[in-house]
Regions:
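Short, small-residue alpha-helix embedded
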Residues: 1-4, 49, 160
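Short alpha-helical "patches" and their helix-cap loops
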Residues: 11-20, 49-54, 126-128
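Mixed-charge interfacial surface used for oligomerization/domain docking
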Residues: 27-114
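Gly/His-enriched, cation/cofactor- and phosphate-binding structural elements
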Residues: 75-173
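Short alpha-helices
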Residues: 1-44
Length: 173
């Protein structure tokens, strides 16, 4: 879209990095630190416009802040992933772990790389259970989500269910 509306301007780093995470390509080494800092910023057009015009010095400082946050986030994600348990979901073996929603993508990537199939991350509140499914590019987990009334994309999808069904999920069968 940027190229269409701004054909004579380079795509801002902010947009490149957001796309890099959104489609889980991770082509740019700077994406993770930049996005870790971005996640702490106000989600306003004014602030995002400022960030598209960062000087190289401002961008370096922003990235340094984000690099420290990304390192801590990755450490916490690996710690969460260590608590994973096996499960069989609709006849498919995978791994599951209790994880806050903000960790679903990274923990899911770590665990689905181990299984070769999928990872299921879940969290429960009084409103119900939120389950996120993640898979590597060689496995499509959308059918699993759809079987529970959910949806999403082939490698990132999810569903919700009542808390009363949590024991059924935790049996892993």
């Amino acid at each position: 879209a940027w190229e269409f509306f701004h054909p004579d301007e380079p795509v801002p780093a902010l947009l490149q990095y957001v796309e890099d995470r959104d489609i889980w390509k991770w082509e740019f080494a700077q994406s993770a630190p930049f996005l870790s800092a971005l996640d702490m910023e106000p989600k306003t057009f004014e602030r995002w416009k400022e960030m598209t015009r960062f000087t190289p010095e401002q961008l370096d400082a922003f990235m340094a802040r984000g690099a420290a946050m990304d390192e801590k986030f990755r450490k916490m994600a690996h710690d969460i992933a260590e608590g994973a348990q096996p499960l069989v979901f609709n006849g498919v073996a995978g791994l599951m772990v209790n994880a806050p929603g903000m960790f679903h993508s990274l923990v899911g990537d770590i665990l689905s790389a181990k299984t070769g199939t999928f990872a299921l991350m879940w969290s429960a509140t009084d409103k119900g259970v939120k389950a996120g499914l993640r898979a590597q590019r060689n496995f499509d987990c959308i059918a699993l989500a759809e079987s529970m009334g959910g949806g999403g994309h082939a490698q990132a999808c999810g569903f919700r269910m009542p808390v009363a069904r949590l024991p059924e999920l935790l049996t892993g069968v």
